[in-house]
Amino acid sequence: MQAFLVILFMVVVGAVIGGVTNVIAIRMLFHPFKPYYIFKMRIPFTPGLIPKRREEIATKIGQVIEEHLITESVILQKLNEPNTREAINDLVIKQLSKLKSDDATIRKFANQFDFDLDLDDLINNKLDKTIINKLNNYYYDKQATSINEILPADVITMVDEKLDQAGDLIRERARNYLSSDKGARDIYDMLDTFFAEKGKIVGLLQMFMTKESIAERVQHELIRLTRHPKAKVIIDKVIRDEYETLKSQPLSHVVKEEQFTNISESLVHLVITNLQLNEKMDTPISKLTPKLVDQIQVGVANTITDLIIKQASNHLSTIMTKINLRQMVENQINTFDLDYIERLIIEIANKELKLIMSLGFILGGIIGFFQGIVAIFV
């Protein structure tokens, strides 16, 4: 009986120790939230693991999401899936179906989008000839006038103000290009071509420096050159001189008469093509062309859907760069309260954490059992 009590006691003690140890270990993942000090010395294991490593965790989660979960290829694949295409197409059709409303007319659409045009006057007075004549007369009157005198003063002022930023923008873009991997490769390729053309003379230089080191040196000096004050002065002066030269040129030198005529005719033709007769301006579209809406929904809707997907795919890389998904995830996680993070992890891994605690009790009890047996025989 005594031996049984000893074993039972050791099992209970071992189970309590094992279980409590695992409970404390799990608690130490989250707590304490801040470090504690005794005599200016930080107490070990404060703060807890997750509070201490929260920024690293946020960085890694953001990296995993950007590089493995929500990647450009994944989004491209999703965009081109039949379900996505169908959803976009349904939305486009839904918007186009509004044309079926009884009061939807061309004039109302024009007014809705603030087209400040007297459609009746334009149609009745032969818009094409009127506009072409006015444009041609304007060109003949202004062909000897400089661009500086033709453009409005506020436009000239705006361009003058923005012009000072052009040099800085050019130098910045040049710096970005030279600092990029492509810039480095291009410099190396040009040096490689240069060495191949110069032959043995340049070969002597390679006895002291490798092509890679020469390319790095050239890259460094070019980048440094873009930051040199004199480079800024030269670039700004060239831009300013070219701009002043352009402003002083007469209109006929900048745009030739034949070019102006072609542009005018194309523009007027485009305007006329998109206008209708007066009686059709106030006729509901559903009555004007009963089959038009259905044709639009079938043909144009598919075209618009393809265009949306194509444009989204072509600009996806730029969009992803602008969004900066990794940084967005990091910032969001870092704004979470530690209490919320603790609740979130516990909700996700509640079952597993309970199993870990139970395993601690079980292993502790097993160890206590064997310790009890050893204690009896010893």
Swiss-Prot record:
Transmembrane segments: 4-24, 358-378
Compartments where located: Cell membrane
Membrane topology term: Multi-pass membrane protein
A GO-annotated cellular component: plasma membrane
Keywords: Cell membrane, Membrane, Transmembrane, Transmembrane helix
Classification via InterPro entries: DUF445, UCP032178
Protein name: UPF0754 membrane protein SH1116
